[in-house]
Amino acid sequence: PDASEEELNAAFKHNTRAMFGETIANPALTVLDIEKFAKAAHAHNVPLIVDNTFPTPINCRPIEWGADIVTHSTTKYMDGHGAAVGGAIVDSGNFDWMAHADMYPGLCTPDESYHGITYAEKFGKEGAFITKCTSQLMRDLGCIQSPQNAFILNLGLESLHVRMPRHVENGQAVAEFLENHPKVEYVSYPGLKSNKYYETAKKYMPNGGCGVVSFLSLIHI
């Protein structure tokens, strides 16, 4: 996330098809400057995909900052108990696949396994990607939750808006305690004013990020 615009642009190759980042990276807890990365991705005609697992949509909405596709590991905060493995894909419908048809043949040429449909033509940019995910990729890969796992996830989602502020509050308290502990060498938590990503975190996550704290102890086991 610390790359300059020049470094970002230099990273793109002729076969680059997407840019990927994490809102808050695990485990380093670096914070993505979503607008900067979206600008770079779109300048090279590729979508920005953001993993928003740690903040969840309660604390950050990457699509509003330029992300095209957002992913979540629902096993963490959305589930709330780590009881059911799962994931989610959210498509903004903003990326124009057909405008770059030569780069995305899977979306812009007929899919013979699905009645010869060309997703970008049939569903437009608003539905091409997510329809391919649900109609073809889920069919071929089998990534469908069991009814019990879906039930557990739905229960967790009901309380997500209540739990996330508490997670942030607890994470902040733990981070501040560790930062002042003589046996701790370094603490990484975007909510600390001493953290290099503090201002970026406040921009994209004004209500806080998550409850995860990373630290380096002076105690060697």
Kindly label every feature range from the protein language model:
Residues 1-180, 188:
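Conserved PLP-enzyme active-site core in the AAT-like
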Residues 219-221:
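Conserved small/polar residues in nucleotide/adenosyl-binding loops
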